[in-house]
Design a protein with these regions (language model features):
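Signature of uroporphyrinogen-III synthase
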Residues: 1-239
Length: 239
């Protein structure tokens, strides 16, 4: 029987865990990162609106902790709102914000959207966690676009029960789902080289896959993003 370790926050992995368990899959929820909110600049402290503005929400956490600061702008018809991933899109829709989402749930997917090919964009406001999305920022700045980071939360490493993870891993090599390069680094610090050889790591992009292999992971499966549907596609393929 296939076994799975989910490493996202519990609230973000509950739906996937329930689906897997309904299918008889032994599933361990083992969050590697936790989130805490940061103070967010109020709208009047952001540069005044000028020209075409694009808002990019990088995660559902960005919606939860950052939308309140720029809701008026996000609701403006002159502003295009982009969501990274289905969960982020659903979070915005639940707040009555119209948004678009690339099929590919990463920075490369955002950059491939038609709006970044054709439109004359003056500024992009990236609502995100502290750090991350460097590729997106560099690419946009290289195109002459003003990029404003709105950091509304930070990730940190919580205390984890390594014995619980070890016990689960001893019962058979699982599929381990990680959503970021940071999570791969954290996981690598917690497991043995034998686990890296025997377990399959499911990652959200080619960039993270390359990072995982460089850290010693032998079996790396690349998903089309970090979302549940992308993982299920890989899960089905590995059966």
């Amino acid at each position: 029987m296939k076994r799975v370790v989910l490493t996202r926050q519990t609230k973000d992995s509950n739906a996937l865990a329930s689906l897997l368990r309904e299918q008889g899959v032994e599933t361990l929820q083992f969050p590697l990162m936790a989130i805490e909110p940061l103070p967010v600049d109020s709208p009047e402290r952001l540069p005044a609106e000028h020209g075409l503005t694009v808002l990019v929400f990088t995660s559902s956490n960005a919606v939860q902790y950052g939308l309140h600061a720029i809701r008026d702008l996000a609701s403006n018809d002159s502003c295009t709102v982009i969501a990274v991933g289905k969960r982020t899109l659903e979070a915005l829709q639940s707040e009555s914000i119209d948004a678009i989402a690339p099929e590919r749930e990463d920075s490369e997917g955002i950059l491939e959207l038609p709006i970044f090919q054709d439109a004359m964009i003056d500024r992009v406001i990236v609502v995100k966690g502290e750090g991350g999305r460097d590729l997106l920022q560099r690419a946009l700045i290289g195109r002459g676009v003003t990029v404003i980071d709105l950091n509304c939360y930070r990730r940190y490493w919580p205390a984890v029960d390594v014995d619980k993870l070890d016990q689960f891993l001893e019962d058979g090599a699982p599929l381990i789902h990680v959503a970021s390069g940071e999570a791969v680094v954290r996981l690598t610090d917690l497991v043995s080289t034998a686990v890296q050889r025997q377990s399959s790591l499911v990652v959200p992009s080619g960039r993270v896959a390359h990072q995982a292999r460089a850290l010693g992971w032998h079996r790396v499966e690349e998903a089309e993003g970090a979302g549940d549907a992308a993982f299920i596609e890989v899960f089905s393929r590995c059966e």
